[in-house]
Amino acid sequence: MIKSVILAAGKGTRMKSDKPKVLHTIFDKTLLGYIIDAVNKTGLADENFVIVGHQAERMEEFLKNNYQNAKPVLQSPQLGTGHAVSMVVPYLKDFKGQVIILNGDLPLIRPETIKEIIEFHNSNGSDLTIMSAIFDNPTGYGRVIKNEQGHVEAIIEEKDTTPEQKAVKEINAGVYVLNWEKINPAFAELKSDNAQGEYYLTDIVKWANKQNMKVKAYILKDNEELFGINCKAQLAEATKMMNRRVINKHLENGVQIVDPETTWISPETEIGADTIIYPYCYINGKNIIGKNCKIGPFAHLRGDVILEDEVKIGNFVEVKKTRMKSHTNACHLSYIGDSEFGSNVNIGAGTITANYNPLTKEKSKTILEDNVKIGSNSVLVAPVTVKEGANVGALSVITKDIPAWALAITRAPLRVLECWVKKHLE
């Protein structure tokens, strides 16, 4: 098994936020979460070390609540990327395996890419492997300098390049795989004699070459994975990139998405073939949508939603933490939360599941069994169960369980006051 080191100590000043950069979200999942999950999905890492610094306590709390195999390691003061990695040296004194180092603001990197760079490292017998990319316009990036045998000799920051080096289009992508036992002594020998007075991680390349070690570069196949996030504009752009990636996957798997430009689907949503997603839908969090469903237009699924086959969620319907069995419809203007619906259930327009008690701050469940019909503009006050086949009349407020095959009506009887308007106009 390998270890990962994820660099996440920075503040992210350009984000203009009180929140650490890596705790900003795409589809309600943090940038840091995407990186940790990508590493975990490879099945190769048994431990992740996350370097924290800015708002360290907040970062530690996030890791404690969400990632049990991620250990926060404090970097204080923050003296550069090389210094950051050196913070894990005491934790890996006897470790003889491999370590992968990644930046915490690369949410688009795929698990497959992480596996590939590790396999590349092993198949080439490298001591140190860096991830690189070929850019037509490499301006602003450090250049990867190789010898005639294709071994990496150095990573040179652009401001320090010669004209010949500046013409190189292969850049440093900021991901490293190293044989820990061989490379970790480098961190004690890094120097801060540069304009920033920092210890650079890139200097381990020169160190390894001085020790006659083998340093290779794995060239990234899809440069989009390298897209880093330093400001809110880049966060928005990364969200678009991820969304397009997700949509393309669903299109390839037989889902019909009428307008990909106005449809947003989280990476953790599963959708069955022949389901149709109409324009202006926002599907967030973890969801499972079956086959031959119809979603939208203007629908919002907020996470933990399971829709079995041939379910319809129509325009201006919001659903969260709900399971609906097959052939159930909620087609118009409804809020459905914390619910379980059977099959062949029909939800009339304007129906609300009142799931939240503001006094106790608790949420309760609404259960509708098979073949239940709910009339328009009804409110189901949870906790409540409507048994099989029961009907609820329009404009009803349901606060008690309804027995099977019953009709429940709570609205006031109709009153007609003849000539009332005419009398008031006289």
Predicted regions and their residues:
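Rossmann-like NAD(P)H-binding beta-loop-alpha module
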Residues: 133-164
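Catalytic-core segments of class I nucleotidyltransferases/pyrophosphorylases
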Residues: 153-240
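Conserved N-terminal catalytic core of the sugar/cofactor nucleotidyltransferase
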Residues: 31-102, 108-112, 116-119
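Hydrophobic targeting segments
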Residues: 2-6, 32, 47-50, 231
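Structural signal for interior beta-strand "rungs" in well-ordered beta-sheet cores
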Residues: 256-410, 414-415
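Conserved donor-nucleotide/metal-binding helix-loop-beta segment in metal-dependent transferases, i.e.
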Residues: 112-139
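N-terminal nucleotide-binding beta1-loop-alpha1 segment
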Residues: 1-17
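Short aromatic/basic micro-patch
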Residues: 25, 108, 177, 228-229, ...
